[in-house]
């Protein structure tokens, strides 16, 4: 609390029980949570320190290596702790008893803290696992399946999401009268390889099943690989449903039906609740459950029409005429629907847009003029894509309007035509957004490639810093600080020498590590938002890098390349110095023997 009183803004730290980067690229489960957290800290004028653990180069199988405020063999130290924050968001599972003990000790001391995901005692934001598993099982039952296998997470996570989803599966099997057989349960540890091995175990168990529910999408992906290898056709021989609805699930073959978790919303809610704690409001330990939604694709056995209905949110339509809806009623319904899909817009923004859209829609219907509605929709689509959200999320708002169109006093054909045109506008916005992303990706890849080439050939630190200063600024990264640890007594990370990589002329700062970020580098009067990535030197734990918490998808590769370049420069410097000393020794030897 003392830090908040010394500054204008509260500082929120974020830690996870595993790494954010899979070697150099983001892990898709944490990414939307982090984006939700960042959006909320911007909305509520809070400082942010994101702990982004890094994978070990060349070891894509090592995924439990988080950025953590304590130095351990299975984590990398970053300065995000009770000494420089006002509260922490901790994302479960923690994967280590020592990490659980650490955060529970903070709770016992009264430090503000909230969890995302189940597994620890304390205030928690969780997905409604029971609702999600139940919807998956009922959907498979509707397809005629009576024997449904289950790929669970980790046996060590029975107090967390693994246990909650497994218990929900068992309860659903009993309630729906499905085949009960312990051989139908296997553990996949929520990773692709584990899912593949779990499916092999299920196939070899001798138990009969025609469908599978996986506890997450990575396990489902591995299960699909094993089924393909065994010659099983999906969904004709075995139907499969995942959990999480990660972006890559939509491009699998066949596309994966999955339970969608509103991860962005969970991150956003975590900030809201943590700020309540920081300001002195006590929170009970009762978890806040966020609703899930089954996203229908091909892997469950649904045909094209059902998938299209789900994509366009057309499945639920009223069957009886009621009183004409008001703008307030439409706003409420649209807000609830869009909120489930949004990944970059806050609730109050969504409500404002929905109110404007509902008002414009009713105005266009009443005046027989489509322009007010079309203009408002185009404006909303532009603002949505500018915030980095998906234009497609407004399809669900159009579905709400369509479901209510038959209650309007005007001829029904008129609002229907208006909404058909709205679908076309959204489609055009999606196409434009996709093209923009393709262009941006090519431009960024070109700059990252050039930077990589320069770092690979750099033999001294001056070349490294010059290359980074030029290309990071061009890529829109305006904050990039390199901190190298220095020891004091028995503390190897007590001090840091911090260099501003984007502004190399700025003097190197010598600062207490646990007081990061240095106050003298926070002078613009606005909240800071920083992502901290560990740097591992040849001895491990050399330091960390701090970036703007904006381009998280780029930062892992940049940090890894910089770490490798600095190590290369160090080795070159040591080799050059060794050669110089050897030459001096040879000269002395020659002079000695020439006498």
Where are these regions (language model features)?
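Signal-transmission linkers at sensory-effector interfaces
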Residues: 308-336, 373-376, 411-461, 571, ...
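Catalytic cores of nucleotide-enabled group-transfer and carboxylate-activating enzymes in metabolic
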Residues: 253, 257, 455-456, 477, ...
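GAF sensory domains
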Residues: 380-388, 397, 473-560
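Heme-based O2/NO sensor domains and their adjacent alpha-helical segments
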Residues: 345-409, 497-502, 521-524
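Helix-loop-beta substructure at the N-terminus of cytosolic sensory domains
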Residues: 347-355, 363, 367, 391, ...
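Primarily the dimerization/phosphotransfer
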Residues: 577-595
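Bacterial carbohydrate/catabolite-sensing allosteric modules
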Residues: 1-348, 352-368
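Amphipathic alpha-helical "output/dimerization" segments
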Residues: 395-400, 414-424, 467-469, 546-570
């Amino acid at each position: 609390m003392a830090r908040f009183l010394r500054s204008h803004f509260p500082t929120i730290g974020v830690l996870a029980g595993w790494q954010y980067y899979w070697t150099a690229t983001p892990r898709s489960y944490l990414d939307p949570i982090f984006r939700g957290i960042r959006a909320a800290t911007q909305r509520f004028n809070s400082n942010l320190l994101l702990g982004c653990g890094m994978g070990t180069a060349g070891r894509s199988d090592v995924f439990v290596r988080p950025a953590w405020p304590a130095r351990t063999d299975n984590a990398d130290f970053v300065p995000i702790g009770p000494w420089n924050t006002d509260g922490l968001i901790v994302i479960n599972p923690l994967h280590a008893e020592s990490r659980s003990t650490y955060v529970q000790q903070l709770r016992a001391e009264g430090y503000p803290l909230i969890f995302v995901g189940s597994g620890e005692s304390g205030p928690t934001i969780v997905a409604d696992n029971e609702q999600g598993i139940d919807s998956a099982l009922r959907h498979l039952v509707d397809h005629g399946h009576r024997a449904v296998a289950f790929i669970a997470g980790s046996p060590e996570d029975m107090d967390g999401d693994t246990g909650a989803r497994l218990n929900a599966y068992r309860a659903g099997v009993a309630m729906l009268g499905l085949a009960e057989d312990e051989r139908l349960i296997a553990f996949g540890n929520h990773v692709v390889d584990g899912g593949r091995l779990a499916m092999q175990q299920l196939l070899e168990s001798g138990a009969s099943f025609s469908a599978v529910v996986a506890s997450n999408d990575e396990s489902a992906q591995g299960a699909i690989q094993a089924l393909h290898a065994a010659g099983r056709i999906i969904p004709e021989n075995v139907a499969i449903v995942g959990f999480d609805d990660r972006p890559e699930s939509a491009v699998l073959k066949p596309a994966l039906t999955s339970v969608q978790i509103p991860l962005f919303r969970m991150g956003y809610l975590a900030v809201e609740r943590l700020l309540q704690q920081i300001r002195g409001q006590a929170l009970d330990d009762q978890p806040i459950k966020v609703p899930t939604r089954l996203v229908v694709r091909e892997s469950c056995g649904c045909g094209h029409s059902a998938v299209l209905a789900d994509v366009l949110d057309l499945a639920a339509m009223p069957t009886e005429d009621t009183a004409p809806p008001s703008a307030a009623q439409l706003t409420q319904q649209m807000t609830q629907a869009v909120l489930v899909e949004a990944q970059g817009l806050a609730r109050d923004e969504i409500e404002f847009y929905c109110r404007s859209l509902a008002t414009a829609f009713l105005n266009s219907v009443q005046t027989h003029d489509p322009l007010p509605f079309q203009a408002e929709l185009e404006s909303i689509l532009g603002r949505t894509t500018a915030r980095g959200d998906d234009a497609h999320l407004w399809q669900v708002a159009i579905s709400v309007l369509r479901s209510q169109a038959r209650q309007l006093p005007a001829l029904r054909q008129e609002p229907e035509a208006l909404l058909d045109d709205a679908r076309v506008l959204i489609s055009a916005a999606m196409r434009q957004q996709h093209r923009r992303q393709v262009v941006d990706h090519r431009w960024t890849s070109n700059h990252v490639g050039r930077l990589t080439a320069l770092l690979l050939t750099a033999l001294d630190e001056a070349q490294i810093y010059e290359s980074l200063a030029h290309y990071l600024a061009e890529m829109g990264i305006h904050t990039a600080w390199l901190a190298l640890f220095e020891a004091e007594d028995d503390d190897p990370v007590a001090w840091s020498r911090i260099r501003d990589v984007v502004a190399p002329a700025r003097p190197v700062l010598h600062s207490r590590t646990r007081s990061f970020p240095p106050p003298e580098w926070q002078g613009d009067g606005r909240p800071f938002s920083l992502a901290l990535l560990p740097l591992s030197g040849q001895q491990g734990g050399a330091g960390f890098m701090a970036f703007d918490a904006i381009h998280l998808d780029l930062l892992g590769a940049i940090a890894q390349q910089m770490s490798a370049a600095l190590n290369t420069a160090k080795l070159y410097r040591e080799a050059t110095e060794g050669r110089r000393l050897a030459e001096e020794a040879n000269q002395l030897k020659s002079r000695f023997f020439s006498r």
